[in-house]
Amino acid sequence: MKNIKKFPFILTILSLLTIIVPANAEIKVVASIKPIHSLVSYLMDGVGKPDLIVDGYASPHGFALKPSHAKMLQNADLIFWVGEDLENFLEKPLNSIAKKA
């Protein structure tokens, strides 16, 4: 429920990014799981396409990051994730790899 309360804040950030980032620069957005990726894709329609970390039929509970995922996080301007309760595999990488996001 607390994540739903964050939704207006997320929309505001996305809106500000479209104003701040130059028109020809692509915003690099990463979503952790498919439901979040679907929502972010809808919001970014016409602006860009977010990358997805946990794809296919993988479970976020026992997921292990690959080097390609670490690169996604490192290059991201904005990262959407549920939190450490569901995606504990992202907690440390977000603190160390994705400092600019």
Model-derived features: positions:
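Extracytoplasmic metal-acquisition and chelation regions
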Residues: K2, P8, N24-A101
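Bacterial N-terminal signal peptides
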Residues: P8-I19
